[in-house]
């Protein structure tokens, strides 16, 4: 899961080298919380620093590329989310949506693909949900209710074109028709602070 790349990933590739094997690709997971505090049925984790989390993905890339025969092998993040627990109210919040927006803006830098865990809150390992919002993994709550993070993905889906701006708070692209589209986020907890952004965009 990317927890101990230096041991498991490097050892795996050393084994492949010794046995004359070549993997088609490398897979890993990506979750971005500290161990949660439990309160009854729920877990309340603290979000990890996003840059620190992204650095772990780059570490996987660097380990793979340190082997000449495996350099450039695609890495697929087969699960990612903030929390790995299906009873985390964070999943149902605007904060989750904003944090995931930042992750989406960067996950493609060193990964071939990345798959959000998961689409719906009906999670087979936990059975049928007992309420529409119970902290499940999904983008969509029980009864087909889109959660805030669903809209993050919907907005990013519309970002097709050439990226002309990317920062810690926003991404802007210019489409073939010359129009600009962007997504901005503000992962502030509680009352939070207002966010003011200024963009300098090319017109040519």
Which residue ranges define each predicted feature?
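Noncatalytic carbohydrate-binding groove/subsite architecture in carbohydrate-active enzymes
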Residues: 1-112
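Glycine-rich beta-alpha junction loops
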Residues: 30-32, 81-82, 118-123, 188
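A Trp-anchored, charged/polar loop motif used as the substrate-binding/catalytic surface
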Residues: 54-55, 163-169
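Alpha-helix capping/termination and helix-coil
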Residues: 64, 68, 111, 157-164, ...
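Structural beta-sheet core signal
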Residues: 77, 116, 182-184
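Substrate-binding clefts and catalytic carboxylate motifs of secreted carbohydrate-active enzymes
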Residues: 87-92, 97-100, 104-125, 163, ...
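Catalytic cores of secreted or luminal carbohydrate-active enzymes
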Residues: 104, 118, 130-166
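Carbohydrate-binding surface patches
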Residues: 169-204
